[in-house]
């Protein structure tokens, strides 16, 4: 009987006494098989069917070459490489060294290699390793690797083999529940898939430009039509599309489309995404499709969960992208324009995610420590690009395109990374005992921010038609970016002006006794006004009906610094028209940005809890000002003696935007009546009467708010070493870092 089964299991195989391959039973037990036909000795002893797998097995081993020719070949290759080093060194002696050369950038460009195979890529930045790793990376090495399996079969094997180390590592990252069940039953019905993809195309794709939408549309519907045979990478992409689409829907829409609550749908699709990422072997992937799916998932995840886990996954994806060479521009390796453009889009979206998540966790972006030559994406529409192109399409700067918003954010990322690297270099110089040198060149922070302002105003804002929702969003984001850079720069000046223990330090530019308070109040008033405008535009993004489909994304971009500064000022300023405007803006964004504390880790809560406390105290101050106008007036007189012009209303800078309306809020009307704060007036001593002084904003808050101050937010604002005694006061003289002007 066993012999018959053995014969049936090997149709067409020549009868021989010794088989080519190990039987399945011996291979599973990891024991040596004598490969006897029809049954090996191990199977006879175990009384099991002896089944030999079909096929010819692995490719025959290459005959070993003698050692002498191998050594000679390697020696010749080494001599050639050393010769290239010598030529490069001689060339460097004749030409001045640039900043990029000093970072090792040119070395990497000369000696790196990029292996691209269909939708996969692998990057090696050292030529010494290329030949040695070629066999390991791109040739079969296992016993049964005489043929190259398809992506689908290899992914399925990795997902179903319990002994796969890659699966164990992926399951450790995404949780061991990620290997619990098949994915087929998590796909939506055809009708639901149609609606979800429409929601994705309208709500998500314009903000996360990592795809070529005509190509993605074809891939999506081909996969939906054949779910039973779709490969793991494409299946992962399907689930991330569905997950991000659900993220962009409000609860009522989700209930109508999926017949389940938004919370239930998010839990189901997030589980499916995590399971697909684990089974698709994300940690070792070389697939662009898999990386696109992971980046899309991380772009949507902060709307539901912005814990430290999401930040850690961002770091993981960043390094996966580097192993695939996305930090190198495709033109260096002769890639086609279509592939080069998609690689650029994907890399810069990773940098955007990295910048946002690092800011929320009060850390520097990962990209700041790496050199990249990947150019920003082209300013084109998707219809201008096709896989068959041999030359890149011409950019369109006469009107806005699909990539306008992405490029606005790329401009900000580039400037932020340059400023961060400059700050590190200045700090390192200071630690060495030398004085930071500030030159009036293009390498100063002042000039970098001026150039950013000029690019946004001259290239992007003029082509944005604010009557078009997507262009309205792009214009608003550009103006928020300028306001944020202005706040960082001005706060650096304030930090350098502060007095330590009542005395000015020698390495800070000390204001004269006659102008100390006046200068501090003037800068603080400018900070207050700019913070209000940032919150005003942010409130418009959260409440405007014209861009309601993008509200899900705006909710995740909390302007921590501006909000904290406005709330702290409301706790100390007297009642005025400007404060009423600030209160309206704060109320709008506070409700829109409200954090679900049950889904956040301590790092995020370390930012949100002070905001909650500041909001409660600001409400208390407002109530006290309304019920005891005498106390409010006294406080106002104390401040106004310092600078009578401080609270004079200034004209609005965003007059073309509609004023945020409570009735437009997607998730219902905002609370217009602040809740009462437990405790009496004595429980918050001096809340409505503490005047502003020249000792600095956080010092005033220390006395007003007690132990919980703006500390977490101050860590997010760098102190620039270039604001020093010699250049600090003059570096911003005549420098307009304000928000964009409109004709």
UniProtKB/Swiss-Prot annotation:
Gene3D superfamilies: Zn(2)-C6 fungal-type DNA-binding domain (4.10.240.10). GO terms for biological process: DNA-templated transcription. InterPro entries: Sec_Metabolite_Reg (IPR050613), Transcription_factor_dom_fun (IPR007219), Zn2-C6_fun-type_DNA-bd_sf (IPR036864), Zn2Cys6_DnaBD (IPR001138). CDD domains: fungal_TF_MHR (cd12148), GAL4 (cd00067). Residues 624-635 have a biased composition (Polar residues). Residues 23-50 bind DNA. GO terms for molecular function: DNA binding; DNA-binding transcription factor activity, RNA polymerase II-specific; zinc ion binding. It is found in: Nucleus. Induction: Expression is repressed by glutamine and at alkaline ambient pH and highly induced under nitrogen starvation and acidic pH conditions. It comes from the Eukaryota. Disruption phenotype: Leads to decreased production of bikaverin. Keywords: DNA-binding, Metal-binding, Nucleus, Transcription, Transcription regulation, Zinc. It holds the Pfam family Fungal_trans. Disulfide bonds: none annotated. Residues 421-445, 623-643 are annotated as: Disordered. The keyword Transcription applies. Transcription factor that regulates the expression of the gene cluster that mediates the biosynthesis of bikaverin, a red pigment also considered as a mycotoxin. PANTHER family: UNCHARACTERIZED TRANSCRIPTIONAL REGULATORY PROTEIN, ZN(II)2CYS6 TRANSCRIPTION FACTOR (EUROFUNG). This is Bikaverin cluster transcription factor bik5. It comes from Gibberella fujikuroi (strain CBS 195.34 / IMI 58289 / NRRL A-6831). The lineage of its organism: Eukaryota, Fungi, Dikarya, Ascomycota, Pezizomycotina. The gene is bik5.
């Amino acid at each position: 009987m066993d012999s018959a089964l053995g014969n049936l299991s090997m149709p067409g195989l020549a009868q021989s006494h010794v088989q080519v391959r190990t039987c399945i039973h011996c291979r599973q037990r990891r024991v040596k098989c004598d490969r006897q036909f029809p049954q090996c000795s191990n199977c006879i002893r175990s009384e099991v069917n002896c089944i030999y797998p079909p096929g010819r097995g692995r490719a025959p081993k290459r005959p070993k070459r003698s050692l002498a020719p191998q050594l000679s070949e390697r020696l010749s290759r080494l001599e050639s490489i050393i010769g290239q080093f010598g030529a490069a060194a001689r060339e460097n002696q004749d030409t001045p060294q640039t900043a990029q050369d000093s970072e090792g950038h040119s070395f990497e460009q000369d000696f790196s290699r990029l292996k691209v195979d269909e939708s996969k890529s692998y990057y090696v930045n050292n030529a010494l390793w290329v030949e040695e790793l070629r066999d390991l990376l791109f040739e079969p090495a296992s016993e049964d690797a005489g043929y190259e399996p398809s992506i689908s079969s290899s992914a399925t094997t990795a997902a179903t083999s319990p002994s796969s180390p890659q699966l164990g590592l992926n399951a450790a990252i995404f949780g061991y529940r990620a290997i619990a069940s098949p994915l087929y039953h998590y796909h939506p019905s055809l009708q639901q898939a149609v609606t979800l993809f429409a929601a994705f195309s309208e709500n998500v794709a314009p903000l996360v430009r990592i795809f070529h939408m005509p190509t993605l549309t074809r891939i999506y519907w081909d996969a939906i039509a054949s779910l039973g045979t779709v490969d793991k990478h494409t299946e992962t992409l399907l689930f991330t599309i569905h997950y991000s689409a659900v993220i962009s829907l409000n609860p009522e829409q989700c209930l109508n489309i999926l017949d389940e609550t938004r919370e239930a749908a998010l839990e189901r699709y997030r589980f499916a995404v995590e399971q697909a990422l684990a089974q698709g072997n994300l940690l070792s992937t070389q697939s662009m499709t898999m990386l696109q799916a992971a980046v899309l998932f991380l772009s949507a995840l902060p709307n539901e969960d912005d814990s430290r886990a999401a930040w850690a996954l961002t770091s993981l994806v960043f390094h996966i992208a580097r192993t695939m060479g996305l930090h190198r521009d495709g033109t260096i390796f002769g890639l086609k324009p279509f592939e080069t453009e998609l690689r650029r889009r994907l890399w810069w979206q990773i940098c955007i995610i990295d910048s946002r998540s690092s800011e929320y966790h009060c850390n520097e972006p990962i990209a700041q420590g790496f050199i990249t030559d990947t150019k920003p994406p082209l300013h084109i529409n998707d219809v201008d690009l096709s896989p068959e192109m041999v030359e890149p399409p011409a950019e369109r700067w006469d009107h806005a395109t699909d990539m306008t918003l992405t490029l606005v954010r790329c401009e900000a990322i580039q400037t932020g990374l340059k400023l961060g690297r400059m700050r590190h270099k200045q700090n390192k110089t200071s630690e060495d005992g030398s004085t930071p040198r500030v030159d009036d060149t293009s390498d100063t922070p002042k000039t970098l921010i001026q150039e950013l302002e000029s690019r946004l105003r001259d290239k992007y804002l003029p082509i944005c038609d604010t009557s078009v929702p997507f262009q309205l969003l792009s214009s608003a984001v550009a103006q928020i970016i300028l306001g944020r850079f202005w706040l960082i720069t001005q706060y650096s000046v304030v930090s350098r002006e502060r007095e330590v223990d009542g005395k000015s330090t020698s390495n800070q530019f000390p204001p004269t006794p006659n102008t100390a308070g006046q200068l501090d109040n003037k800068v603080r008033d400018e900070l207050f006004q700019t913070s209000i405008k940032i919150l005003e535009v942010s409130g418009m993004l959260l409440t405007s009906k014209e861009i309601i489909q993008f509200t899900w994304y705006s909710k995740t971009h909390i302007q921590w610094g501006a909000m904290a500064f406005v709330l702290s000022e409301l706790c100390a300023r007297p009642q005025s028209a400007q404060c009423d405007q600030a209160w309206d803006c704060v109320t709008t964004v506070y409700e829109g940005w409200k954090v679900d504390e049950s889904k956040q880790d301590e790092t995020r809560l370390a930012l949100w809890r002070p905001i909650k406390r500041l909001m409660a105290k600001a409400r208390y101050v407002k109530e006290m000002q309304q019920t005891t106008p005498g106390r409010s007036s006294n406080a106002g007189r104390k401040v106004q003696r310092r600078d009578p012009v401080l609270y004079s209303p200034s004209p609005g800078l965003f007059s073309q935007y509609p004023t945020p309306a409570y009735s437009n809020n997607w998730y219902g009307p905002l609370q217009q009546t602040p809740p009462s704060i437990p405790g009496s007036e004595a429980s918050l001593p001096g809340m409505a009467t503490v005047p502003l002084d020249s000792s600095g904003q956080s010092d005033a808050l220390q006395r007003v708010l007690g132990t919980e101050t703006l500390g977490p937010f101050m860590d997010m604002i760098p102190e620039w070493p270039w604001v020093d005694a010699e250049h600090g006061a003059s570096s911003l003289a005549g420098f307009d870092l304000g928000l964009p002007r409109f004709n």
